[in-house]
Structures are given as C-alpha cells and as structure tokens.
C-alpha cells in the first residue's frame, strides 16, 4: 500500500510542477490552483491523495483517492486530522498548532510551483508534517512552500 500512495503523491506533484493557471491532470482528475502571495507561484491546496478514512475505512490501509468529474478547485486548505484544539496552555509555539477545521476526512496534500509552464524536470520536495497522529497539519503557516517554489528550487 505504501508504494501506490508514494506513486500517487509523486504523480500529482509532477503533474502540478508543469502547470500554470490552467487546470492540470492528476491520476484522479483535473485540478486548478490559485496564485500565491507571489503571483509567480501557483498554489494547489487540498488535493486528496487517498480515499477519506471514514466509516469502514477507519484505521485501515489507505485506498486510492476516488476520481472526480470536471475540474476540482484546489484553492483552500483541507481540514486537519482530528486532534486537540489549540489552547494557550500548550507549551509549544502557537504557529505550529492547528487552528482551522478538523475532520477524519483529512488525507490531502498541497503543492507550490512556479506559475509558468515548463517542460523542464524539477526536483520534488515532499514534506510530511509530524505530530504523532495527535497534532499537526499541512495548513500550518510554518509549512508554507512558497518560499522554496519562488527560488525555483522545487
């Protein structure tokens, strides 16, 4: 199961690295991103990389993301996995804590890429946040990939 998940993540990243504002094709369907704070960057937020782990899929090996029809708008972060809500009494830095919606349906990835199309192959940087299934999220501002993408490195 790990190999198909890695392959799906890689396929989505490769497809998006060659994109501009036009929708791009992934293994599950078309997605459209949005301009980043730096308009030379396109950001794709909330792309599913597996089927939602709810109901009978709860605590089971992940299954491929179901395909969708049309163009999926990928311009907003997805919910974080279920975890403790942020409080001021936690001993760690506030900006590393989840602030938004939480849900069991939380298997999504975000991609930052230069906004112009390119046929050049680029390295892909995959960052999986920690948290031990207790905390963390791909929407935490400290994990924003725009800085790396704006340097043209990934």
Task: Enumerate the language-model features and the residues they cover.
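Non-catalytic accessory segments of hydrolases
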Residues: 3, 16-154
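Classical eukaryotic N-terminal signal peptides for Sec-dependent ER targeting/secretion
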Residues: 1-11
């Amino acid at each position: 199961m790990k190999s198909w998940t890695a392959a799906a993540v890689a396929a989505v990243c490769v497809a998006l690295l060659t994109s501009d504002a036009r929708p791009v094709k992934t293994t599950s369907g078309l997605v459209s991103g949005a301009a980043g704070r730096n308009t030379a960057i396109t950001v794709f937020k909330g792309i599913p990389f597996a089927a939602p782990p709810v109901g009978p899929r709860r605590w089971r090996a992940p299954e491929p993301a179901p395909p969708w029809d049309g163009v999926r708008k990928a311009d907003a972060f997805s919910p974080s996995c279920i975890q403790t809500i942020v409080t001021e009494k936690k001993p760690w830095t506030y900006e590393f804590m989840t602030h938004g919606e939480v849900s069991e349906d939380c298997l999504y990835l975000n991609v930052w890429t230069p906004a112009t199309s390119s046929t050049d192959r680029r390295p892909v940087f995959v960052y999986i946040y920690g948290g031990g299934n207790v905390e963390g999220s791909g929407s935490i501002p400290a994990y924003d990939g725009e800085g790396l993408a704006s340097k043209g490195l990934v």
